[in-house]
Amino acid sequence: MSQEDSTSAAAAQQPTSRPAPKLNERILSSLSRRGGGAHPWHDLEIGPGAPAVFNVVVEITKGSKVKYELDKKTGLIKVDRVLYSSVVYPHNYGFIPRTLCEDNDPMDVLVLMQEPVIPGSFLRARAIGLMPMIDQGEKDDKIIAVCADDPEYRHYSTSVSLLPRLQEIKRLEDYKKNENKEVAVDAFLPATTAREAIQYSMDLYAQYILQSLRQ
């Protein structure tokens, strides 16, 4: 089978309900970086229990006004900006390794737990829901999870019983508005939808790994 036929066959197997992101230079540069230390997006395992239980790399600490994010080229956590006003991140925030979403980034996760976690650390989390978000016209959904090793939170399997705390998460909309950015947060979706979204992002990542190896 020719390379063109192989590409066409792979495209035919993609889910038609969601558009696939283009394999851009930002992704390719991080995929090709193998000369230095481990890259948290590509080298850390997602975990054997995924999509239900999975590893999360923490980018932003609970209670922080500093927005950190992964530098995709180096694999380091960099400072992006400091939030406006008194808005802080209500929970630890990070991403799931070896996943890929339509915005060309790994899947975002908010992790509910008792303590703040240092940026660059990773932990085990369990999906309990999904927060649909539109950020400046683009889909930017967030997985809502609990720390699987926190005795205060690990028994939760659905977001319904955590609704009061989840309202804090919707304040993410506030900090965007303070920066004159249009963002909309819809009603929380159940854990089954979250697991489906994670599985889709895992499949999309695997597809692009294969594609990058052909180039």
Curated annotation (Swiss-Prot):
Residue sites binding Mg(2+) 2 per the record: 108
CDD domains found in the cross-reference section: pyrophosphatase
First-level EC class: hydrolase
GO biological process, one term: phosphate-containing compound metabolic process
EC assignment: 3.6.1.1
Keywords on record: Cytoplasm, Hydrolase, Magnesium, Metal-binding
Start and end residues of each stretch annotated as Disordered: 1-24
Tissue specificity: Expressed in metabolically active tissue such as root, shoot, embryo and aleurone.
Positions of Mg(2+) 1 binding: 103, 108, 140
Listed Gene3D superfamilies: Inorganic pyrophosphatase
Annotated Low complexity bias: 1-21
Predominant subcellular localization, coarse grouping: cytoplasm
Cofactor(s) named in the record: Mg(2+)
Catalytic activity as recorded in UniProt: diphosphate + H2O = 2 phosphate + H(+)
UniProt cross-references to InterPro entries, sorted A to Z: Pyrophosphatase, Pyrophosphatase_sf
Tree of life domain: Eukaryota
SUPFAM superfamilies assigned: Inorganic pyrophosphatase
GO molecular function, one term: magnesium ion binding
GO CC annotation terms, alphabetical: cytosol
Annotated compartments: Cytoplasm
Assigned protein family: Belongs to the PPase family.
Cited function: May play a role in germination.
Name this protein carries in UniProt: Soluble inorganic pyrophosphatase
Taxonomic placement: Eukaryota, Viridiplantae, Streptophyta, Embryophyta, Tracheophyta
